[in-house]
Amino acid sequence: MKRTLQHIAVQGMLFASLVFSAFAQAAPPTNLKFCTGGVGGFYEGLGTSIGGKITNDIGNTLKVINTGGSVENAKRLKQGDCDIAIIQSDAVITQPMPASFKAVNAHEEVVYWLYPKGGEVDDFGDMEDDSVAKKYAFATVKGSGASVTLNNWIKTDKDYAGAVPVEFKDWYSAAEAVAQGFTMDSGVRVDIAGMLYIGRAGMLPADITSDFGGQILVGEVNDDSFANAKDANGNPLYTHCGIPKDKTSGLGRSNSISDQATYCLRAQVVFNNAYLNGLDEAETTLVRRAVDKGINSTVKVVR
């Protein structure tokens, strides 16, 4: 009798262990790692809101990761360092991405052309002219979404092939070069025409506006060729739009009469489907629904 009770007890423990093991394998990861953007920026706020709604439904913990922007986010997403990220739509199709992912359109972003007060190139399109391109370089921040757009535009319109980007480590350094109209590279002076910045309308970062607000102006982008760039589904990546006078974050404008002509594009929330690996059907359904609801209930407010 004693042996029978022991046998039953052992069987019960084995059964409980198997049940626990199956449950553990089916449970989602303990963390949801969300790659966003700079500290205090719009990407960080959006990621915190979306991620909070997802983890609240799943019952795990949100880990917000601050990054340098779209390029770094795409890299981290592919490497598995983050599970979900906010990335510019043109970076989604030009940067290496995970084998399987879901992308949802989020908010609209504006392409700002920023140039020095008193500068010659108040319109990005002027850099098509070889005589202008030979005199000036573009300032850009390494790894930023703006660097992706700049390179994509140069590839889209071969007339910009002579334009040279000069990379800076951050927006403050790039803004400083734009404000003074030049930078020194290996002891050689390089004149800077300006730089692109991409973000939510009216939300230029303090790195650009705080110390250099009186030295940098918002210019225009007048070139129809960029409307020809397409995404993987054949849809336009960039659409014509304007920057109203109250959306320059306090910077002066080259066009004092009407909105600044430029392009807009979408940011996307990108989810790595590898997050679902190892989950059973019920848990997969739960996580997918939480992700979809977390994204859509948030971005509908900011679209």
Labelled PLM ranges:
Residues A9-S21:
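Bacterial N-terminal signal peptides
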Residues P29-D57, Y115-Q180:
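Bilobed "Venus flytrap"/periplasmic-binding protein-like clamshell domains
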Residues S49-D57, R76, G80, I84, ...:
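Structured segments of extracytoplasmic/periplasmic soluble domains
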Residues I65-T67, A139-V141, F168, G219-V221:
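Conserved beta-strand termini and adjacent loop/short-helix elements that scaffold enzyme active sites
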Residues S89-V92, G119-E120, A146-S258:
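Pocket-lining segment of extracytoplasmic ligand-binding domains
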